[in-house]
């Protein structure tokens, strides 16, 4: 059982193979959970992630037309786009940018669900279409400013340094207009200066945009510095959760990381 408080920075930590990325993949629809519930409560509504991805038909569906119709609808039209539309975005362990596109083009593509793409409006270049295009560009440059990449707007994404690409991924995710963002090892491979800059960006998301951040990270210094809450996984189970100061001295957590029994841990 795992829950994340709105407007917080919550770190999901644990040894390699604990199931952290699997949790992200289930939350965002890249894996389809075989059971249980994944509920994402935004400001406007609650989305059942498993449901909108398209669940298997159940025997009881045949005697419940409404339930059958709902399940059939999501089977036909459901998918990860509905998870994103509900307000959930993510980044990946391995950077996944459109490398042959410019930096700003990466951010414009991310807004395809928010921009008026009506074919007729585009053909006649209507005022609404031009306004939507202008708003998308303004939004892209706003997030480029937040991640300190305005000067790189017209460079190819594939030509950027590793640290810059990491920040661009966050900007691209934010252009989808999420209420919650899942960051999968965003500081991996970064030097201390880049990690500090990244930490400032993550705090900015929480403090100025009320974004809920769920973070997987192996840099314990960063985790302890920026997290409001920490959840610790080991072999797929939550073994501890609490404030950073509590987690630092939790015997179960120390045992999991050191590969020892709790009885062998001396604090």
Regions found by a protein language model. Give the residues of each.
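Glycine-rich phosphate-binding loops of nucleotide-dependent enzymes
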Residues: 1-267
């Amino acid at each position: 059982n795992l829950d994340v408080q709105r407007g917080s920075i919550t770190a999901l930590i644990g040894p390699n193979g604990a199931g952290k990325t699997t949790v992200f993949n289930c939350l965002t629809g890249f894996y389809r959970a075989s059971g249980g519930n994944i509920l994402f409560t935004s400001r406007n509504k609650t989305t059942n992630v498993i449901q909108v991805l398209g669940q298997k038909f159940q025997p009881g569906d045949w005697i419940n037309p409404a339930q059958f119709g709902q399940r059939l609808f999501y089977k036909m039209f459901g998918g990860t786009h509905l998870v994103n539309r509900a307000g959930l975005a993510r980044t990946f362990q391995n950077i996944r940018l459109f490398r042959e596109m410019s930096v700003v083009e990466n951010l414009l593509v991310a807004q395809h669900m928010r921009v008026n793409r009506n074919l007729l409006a585009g053909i006649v270049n209507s005022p609404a279409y031009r306004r939507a295009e202008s708003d998308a560009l303004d939004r892209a440059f706003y997030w480029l400013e937040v991640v300190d990449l305005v000067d790189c707007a017209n460079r190819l994404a594939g030509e950027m340094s590793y640290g810059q690409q990491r920040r661009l991924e966050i900007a691209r995710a934010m252009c989808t207009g999420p209420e919650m963002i899942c960051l999968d090892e965003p500081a991996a491979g970064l030097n201390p200066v880049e990690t500090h800059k990244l930490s400032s960006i993550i705090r900015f998301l929480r403090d100025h945009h009320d974004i809920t951040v769920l973070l997987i990270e192996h840099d314990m210094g960063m985790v302890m510095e920026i997290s409001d809450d920490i959840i610790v996984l080991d072999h797929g189970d939550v073994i501890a959760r609490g404030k950073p100061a509590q987690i630092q001295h939790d015997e179960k957590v120390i045992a999991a990381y050191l590969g020892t029994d709790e009885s062998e841990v001396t604090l």
